[in-house]
A protein has these predicted regions:
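Positively charged, Gly/Ser-enriched RNA/tRNA-binding surfaces
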Residues: 19-37, 48-49, 72, 82-94, ...
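Auxiliary tRNA-acceptor-end handling modules of aminoacyl-tRNA synthetases
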Residues: 1-20, 69, 179-182
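Polyanion/phosphate-binding surface patch
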Residues: 42, 46-75
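Glycine-rich, mobile lid/loop segments that gate access to catalytic sites or pores
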Residues: 161-171
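Acidic, His- and aromatic-enriched active-site or binding-groove loops in soluble protein domains
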Residues: 63-72, 178-200, 291-293
Length: 452
């Protein structure tokens, strides 16, 4: 029989065990920190009714969605966690307690053209806070503060969370008499870092129909730079000319104040008027996070405030604020840039227990003792030469090997070898547990990411 050649579809990430362990460490950090801020996990179906997922209309979403028929059912794979959240909240609005704080970490699917760093199946991590009728602006500062904490624990140092408010942009465009074109202008401005100011100017004038003067005025406005305090002070000069602008400026000032109170250093967040977010459902504060030494990567995390989350499924006003991290792409880019910590413990076990007798009873009892102490333990039960057993431990990167032979069993001891240092000692089981636990604690101190 002819054998099929195994292959993985283009645009789907499949990791070997060691990098998978690093990816799992990132997931652990996310879950731990999201829980620390009082978020509850939810898991929505990967497959939904196409009608539900496409409630906001077609466009680019419909082009990218994985859609199929099963009998009479028109189905689709979720393409993000936001639309399923809207359905979830509308469906369970009478059972949920508001403000509802949830996180979702899972795979989403988009039929994008496969290319370097772009995936058709990828992990996305979302956090959102949903209010009932109202939602305090304080939440709009707490969300990016969580991102700061998560990225810092990943090991990233040189990153910046850019913050803006769409009410400021809408208000400014209204001052220029461009309210009807504000959506098109924002989507164009959102491409600034990809295509540059000259091409943005061309699109504003030739495609959207702005005058050269208005296009230049917009580019001058979004180019305002300085410290956060300096940018806010320059924006004060526009106050009093548009109500939406004034509201947005008040909100942005409050968000920057609370970001500092949440412990986010000024070098890690900046008021940036170029941030617009292309999606129309954002109504207030918007964010994008970038790595300062790798601007070519683009945004590694983005989100913002929205006031009509479930408008297609419910008449209830459910404002919210949230952010999403494209984990698969972030991990791919970090790996490609050589920024994943090569010394991070990626072994599937802390201890490999090598029984040196035919009877495994003592080995099983010791393994149980080690596991009860929280140490991940494998028993090597294959009848192979000693060298092969040690090679197995070495290839997997297991840091400790415990030998248990007739002499050790008779004396109530075991031999513990640290494969990283080569040191070997004879200890009681309790002493072995303590030694290994301390060693593993030290090995686990490293971060997932090492910035160069």
């Amino acid at each position: 029989m002819e054998k099929l050649k195994p292959r993985t579809l283009s645009g789907f990430m499949e990791l070997l065990p060691a990098p998978q362990q690093k990816f799992e460490r990132m997931l652990e950090i996310l879950r731990k920190n999201f829980a620390l801020y009082g978020f509850t996990p939810i898991d929505t179906p990967v497959i939904e009714s196409a009608e539900i997922l496409l409630a906001k209309g077609g466009g680019e979403t419909e082009k990218q969605i994985y859609r199929f028929q099963k009998g009479d059912s028109d189905l689709a794979l979720r393409f993000d966690h936001t639309v399923p959240l809207a359905k979830y909240v509308a469906l369970h609005e009478n059972e949920l307690c508001f403000p509802f704080r949830r996180y979702a970490i899972g795979k989403v699917y988009r039929g994008e053209r496969a290319q370097r760093g772009r995936f058709r199946e990828f992990y996305q991590a979302d956090i959102d806070i949903i209010g009932d009728g109202k939602l305090s602006v304080v939440n709009e500062a707490e969300i990016p503060s969580i991102i700061y904490k998560v990225f810092s624990e990943f090991g990233l140092k040189r990153f910046c969370i850019s913050v803006n408010n769409r009410k400021i942009l809408n208000g400014f465009y209204a001052m220029l008499g461009l309210t009807e074109k504000s959506g098109d202008i924002m989507r164009t401005v959102d491409k600034l870092d990809k295509i540059g100011p000259d091409k943005v100017r061309v699109i504003l004038v030739e495609d959207i129909g702005l005058s050269q003067q208005d296009a230049d005025e917009i580019l001058r406005f979004i180019a305002i730079r300085g410290t956060n305090a300096e940018v806010l002070e320059r924006l004060e000069a526009y106050r009093g000319r548009d109500e939406a602008f004034d509201t947005g400026l008040d909100e942005l000032t409050t968000v920057t104040k609370y970001l500092a109170a949440f412990g986010v250093p000024e070098e890690n967040f900046a008021v940036d008027l170029t941030i617009a977010r292309g999606l129309d459902y954002y109504t207030g504060t918007v964010y994008e996070t970038r790595m300062l030494d790798h601007p070519e990567i683009g945004a590694i995390c983005a989100g913002g405030r929205y006031d009509n989350l479930a408008e297609y499924y419910s008449d209830r006003s459910l404002p919210g604020v949230g952010v999403a991290i494209g984990l698969t792409r972030l991990f791919y880019v970090l790996d490609e840039q050589g920024m994943l910590n090569p010394d991070l413990l990626t072994a599937p076990a802390d201890v490999l227990l090598l029984p040196m007798t035919d009877d495994f009873t003592a080995a099983v009892e010791l393994a149980t003792r080690l596991r009860n102490a929280g140490l991940r333990t494998q028993i090597y039960s294959e009848q192979k030469k000693f060298k092969a057993k040690m090679t197995y431990a070495d290839k997997l990167g297991i840091p400790y090997v415990v030998f248990l032979g007739e002499d050790e069993i008779a004396q109530g001891t075991c031999s513990v070898k640290n494969l990283r240092t080569g040191q070997q000692v004879s200890l009681s089981p309790d002493e072995a547990v303590e030694l290994i636990r301390k060693g593993i604690s030290e090995l686990n101190k490293g971060s997932v990411i090492l910035e160069k």
